[in-house]
Design a protein with these regions (language model features):
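Non-ligating segments of multi-cofactor redox enzymes
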Residues: 1-263, 269-310
Length: 310
């Protein structure tokens, strides 16, 4: 009898999610931005859909957008209790965090998908790892803190906050908003100034970094990702590892581009539930979970000391 651990597949649902994540991301982008003709007209959709926040980072000013950006909405109304919309936005984000956590980042965020597409562009040199840059991941929590507190301090005469993140740092605003609007409208082009130049530099920097690193904005700068990360350990959607199947080969950790070892911390704040670990696992030990169950706990597994059959 062969002493080596035989390979096996992940549960059907987990395998499906991991295999077709790219398709799910594309569908999420289209559902978030269905008003494609507006891109040619240079017009922003202002229907009832704009009263609903989408889960991922998607600019309100995008001509094709059907919903509001949660970060922009929070900054605009968090400074005053006069706006009932502020309670709705906060409640929506908390609900998404509890239900999905950073699954939103891995499957539903348009800007996250954009960075992944850029990262797939082949370069002469090997893609760089961000493992040595892990301390930078805490920067997004500082940005989240400033994103929430600054609009509380600086409000206009009607109590609306100044959206500092959207105004000075968010590259998605340039990519989805300013660029398509300026291409379609001469008046918008003539109104562009130093702020557009600065944010174009920010977008350009993110594009260059995305060529070298996997989702750098998500890892280091995104306040929305930082918010969802706070819920990763309690969210109903996440990852789990079957200790009885795990052979501790380390393939899942090597496959993870978010620098997470799922066998040690299945619900790590940096995990975006992308499923790369599911595809890499030779024994089907790693899978998605949905619900309160956290799966089998880690314990000594004699098979883990044996080599995995290649």
């Amino acid at each position: 009898m062969d002493k080596k651990k035989k390979t096996s597949k992940a549960p059907p649902v987990s395998g499906f999610l991991a295999r077709f994540r790219g398709f799910a991301q594309a569908c999420a982008v289209l559902l978030t931005n269905p008003h494609l003709p507006n891109l040619l007209k240079g017009q922003i959709y202002r229907g009832k859909g704009k009263t609903v926040c989408v889960p991922g980072l998607n600019c309100y000013s995008c001509p094709a957008a059907t919903g509001a950006c949660p970060i922009g909405a929070v900054q605009s109304v968090i400074g005053s209790s006069k706006f009932k919309f502020s309670y709705y936005v906060t409640g929506t984000l908390i609900l998404l965090g509890v239900l999905l956590g950073r699954f939103v980042c891995g499957f539903l965020c348009p800007f996250g998908w954009f960075q992944e597409l850029i990262h797939k562009i082949p370069l002469p040199k090997k893609k760089l790892s961000t493992k040595k840059l892990r301390p930078l991941r805490y920067l997004k929590y500082l940005i989240l803190l400033l994103t929430v507190t600054l609009p509380l301090i600086f409000t206009n005469e009607v109590g609306m906050g100044n959206p500092f993140f959207c105004k000075y740092l968010c590259p998605q605003g340039v990519l989805e908003g300013a660029i398509p609007l300026s291409l379609a409208s001469e008046s918008v082009r003539s109104a562009l100034g130093s702020l557009f130049t600065w944010k174009s530099v920010v977008l350009g920097a993110v594009v260059v970094l995305s060529l070298l690193f996997y989702r750098p904005f998500c890892k280091w700068l995104c306040p929305l990702g930082a918010f969802y990360a706070l819920f990763n350990r309690v969210s109903l959607t996440g990852m789990q590892v079957d200790a009885h199947k795990c052979v501790h080969c380390g393939r899942c950790a090597k496959a993870c581009k978010m620098d997470v070892d799922v066998t040690k911390t299945p619900d790590h704040p940096e995990c975006i539930r992308c499923g790369m670990c599911v595809k890499a696992c030779p024994t089907g030990a790693v899978s998605f979970r949905c619900g309160l169950s956290r799966g089998a706990k880690e314990k000594e597994n004699p098979a883990g000391k044996q080599a995995v059959e290649k």
